[in-house]
């Protein structure tokens, strides 16, 4: 593909230059996949329309390794009751990888969204074997539900 800009009108000069290329430059046919970023609607926007009632459906993928109920046991992964708002890598009874132990902050909606999208990209070296939950709405529904899985549920 080639983009060109032509001079179509010049009030001071008239002649045979109309329609001639004034400046041209090549444009790549496509952008390679490694330079193209996918836009993801911010989790705060998606949470506004999220349906927490659909969270358990998405959480079913997680229950092999995690318990969501109050008093749930540590399995291959930490129990997730009361996890929202707590420090990352701080759930009792679970030995976290250095990948998560080295991350400062709390499990916010933004942190959960990034981790659940691509755990190994968000926390390189994590022990979590799950590839990620790619659907943006599914992640929002799951996170909205996770906010409710607590002794004192946090506001979205």
Question: Predicted segment positions?
Answer:
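C-terminal capping alpha-helices of c-type cytochrome domains
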Residues: 1-6, 10, 106-156
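N-terminal post-signal-peptidase region of extra-cytosolic proteins
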Residues: 43-49, 63-67, 95-96
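Gly/Gly-Pro-rich "capping" loops immediately C-terminal to redox-active cysteine motifs
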Residues: 56, 70-109, 129-132
